[in-house]
Amino acid sequence: DLRMSRGLGDVYKRQIITILCVISIIICNRRIKKNASQKLYTEITETPKNNVGLLLGTSPKLKNGNNNLYFDYRIFATLELYKAGKINYILISGDNRKENYNEPEEMKKALMQRGVPEKYIYLDYAGFRTLDSVVRAKEVFGQSRLTIISQRFHNERAIYLAEKNGINAIGYNAKDVNAYSGLKTNIRELFARVKMFIDLAINKQPHFLGDKIIIGK
């Protein structure tokens, strides 16, 4: 029966596509993790010093109004680095596409409330994606060495992006959330890793670049 043959053909096609997607996810994930394995730090005493820490943005609140632990833990990690003298300046890069949504300003406010002087904080309002944040750190803010501050899964991908864009980067891992709370984020991250390789293959550029800003001047 012709219709049955076509139906079976469609099933096989979907199965092959699914298998290829799974293989792609596994390969991309392993490659990113292996690349970052010697460049990630969780102990402040072992972390090398860099002039600038790149703090990757996120919202202070979840959609349900609860505190976003990813935000809180990244702030704590940044404070650890700053107070230990492991970074001199903090570049906060995040999303400010909407008038009432401003990741960099919220993070700046949280850091200043905990004692970081404003003169040591720089803001990048066009960090819409990790790619934008990393590339702009070099092209706009002139950084060729960075300590990237986020959770481990995010740092791994950011380090890979940084190296592909000529930046010598390490990552300082903020505390992660528990597996249940972070399940959706962790699943999304797997697909983000595949997309990162596609972006690199097509030489994807940030949404915006703009005038140069000198950190520490």
Language-model features: locations:
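Single conserved hydrophobic/aromatic residue that forms the stacking wall/gate
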Residues: 1-12
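Hydrophobic membrane-insertion alpha-helices, especially the h-region
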Residues: 13-26
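A structural signal for short, hydrophobic/glycine-enriched beta-strand patches
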Residues: 28-187
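A general structural signal for short secondary-structure boundary/capping elements
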Residues: 97-102, 170, 192-199, 215-217
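A transmembrane-helix-recognition feature enriched in membrane-embedded lipid enzymes
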Residues: 183-205
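Short linear elements at protein peripheries
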Residues: 204-217
